[in-house]
Amino acid sequence: IRQYPKYERVNIFKNQLNEMETPVLNIQSDNNVYPGKNLTLQLKYVHTPQLTVRIYKSLRQPENAWRNLYKNSKSMRGEQVKEITFDMHRPNSYTEGDSTLTIPMDKLGLYEYVITVPGKQLTVSNRFSVSRLAALTRSQTNNPEVLVTDLESGKPIEGATVIYYKTNMMNGTIQRQGEVKTDRLGIAILPAKKKIEHIRPVLREDSSSIITNIY
C-alpha cells in the first residue's frame, strides 16, 4: 500500500488491512465468585496489546442483573473498586491469542466489570455477584425443589431464603412472587400452583446472588 498508493485496487487492500487490524475480544466469565476467590476471565483476542479492567459496584437489583444488559449501563455503575491494566502483547499480533486473567474479589455484592482496549473503540462489560450461595433446582415432582449449598464446599445451607419470581410478559420486568426457607437438608419446596420462572437464594448479608432460571 505504501509503495503503490495510486494502484487502482489499493482501497481493497486498505479495507483488508483495516479488518486485520480491528481489535477482537471475546470473554467468558463467572456469574458468581466466592468471596476471597478470583473473578476468572477467559479471553480470546486479536490486536489488543493492552486491556484495562475496571470493576464497579452495580446499582442494579440482583434480580435485574441481566435485564437490558447494555441499556443505561453507565448510569447503573456505582463506585469503582478496582482498575488493572494487563499487557497482552504477542509476537504475531494478527493471530488469535487466548489467556486467562484473574482478579481477586473479597466483598459480597453485585458488580460489573468493564474491559477496554487503550486507544481503541472496543468495550466489553458484564455483571457478576460475589456470594457464598449456590442454588440448584429440580422439577421432577409437582412441587419444584431448590437445593441451596455453599458454592465452594457444596455443604447444604439451612435457613436460607429462596425468593421466587416470574417475568411480566407485557414489559419484561421480573416480579417477585414470594419466598420460602430451606430445611436442614438445604432444600426449599416451591409452591406448585405458582408460575415460577426464576429463583434467587439469600442468607443474611449475602443477598446479591444473581437469579437462576427454572425450565
Please give the residue ranges for each predicted region.
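N-terminal, cleavable Sec-dependent signal peptides of secreted/periplasmic/extracellular proteins
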Residues: I1-Y215
